[in-house]
């Protein structure tokens, strides 16, 4: 299923704002198969590059995982809306089952996040994500999340 959401449309669903909104676009959303594909354009203007690391700027791995989680949260909230669950929701981290970092992400990179729901229930879910730059996997993780009504 083809789908597109720009950053303004993402902010209608997710509560995150600058400097912590870490996805720029949703390229695909398939609620029947619980899959989402999102983009993060990494620029040298990101605040974290001031100290991580000035001589070799690398995006912190925890922020790559957070961006992956935000893509998963977008999917979970849209799924809840499709199922008729009313109200505003926030998706909270409930755990990181596993995470691996394969290559550094640097300014100028575009990260493609491919996230799928492995076991999504009404208010809890497990998601699996892969982050890629130029077709190469830079990180992967299995995350737990909880859907909480605001």
Predicted stretch roles:
Residues 1-4, 73-112, 138-140:
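Hydrophobic beta-strand-centered segment that forms part of the acyl-chain substrate-binding groove
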Residues 3-4, 16, 38-41, 91, ...:
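Small/polar/charged residue-enriched interaction surfaces, especially the RNA/DNA-contacting tracks
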Residues 18-59, 64:
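Catalytic strand-loop segment that frames the active site of acyl-thioester-processing enzymes
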Residues 2, 35, 77, 105-109, ...:
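HotDog/MaoC-like acyl-thioester-processing domains
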Residues 24-27, 97, 102, 116-118, ...:
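Conserved positions in beta-strands of structured domains
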Residues 26, 59-85:
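Active-site helix/loop of acyl-thioester processing domains in fatty-acid/polyketide metabolism
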Residues 11, 55-56, 100-103:
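Beta-strand-rich interaction surfaces with strong enrichment in secreted/lumenal proteins
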């Amino acid at each position: 299923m083809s789908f597109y959401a720009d950053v303004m449309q993402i902010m209608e669903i997710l509560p995150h704002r600058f400097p912590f909104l870490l996805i720029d676009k949703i390229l695909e959303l398939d609620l029947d198969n619980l899959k989402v594909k999102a983009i993060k354009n990494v620029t040298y203007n990101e605040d974290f590059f001031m100290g991580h690391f000035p001589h070799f700027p690398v995006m912190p791995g925890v922020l790559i995982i957070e961006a992956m989680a935000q893509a998963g949260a977008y999917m979970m909230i849209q799924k809840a809306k499709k199922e008729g669950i009313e109200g505003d929701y926030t998706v909270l981290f409930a755990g990181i089952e596993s995470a691996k970092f394969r290559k550094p992400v640097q300014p100028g990179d575009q990260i493609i996040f491919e996230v799928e729901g492995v076991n999504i229930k009404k208010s809890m879910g497990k998601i699996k994500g892969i982050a890629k730059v130029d077709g190469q996997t830079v990180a992967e993780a299995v995350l737990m999340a909880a859907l909480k009504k605001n």
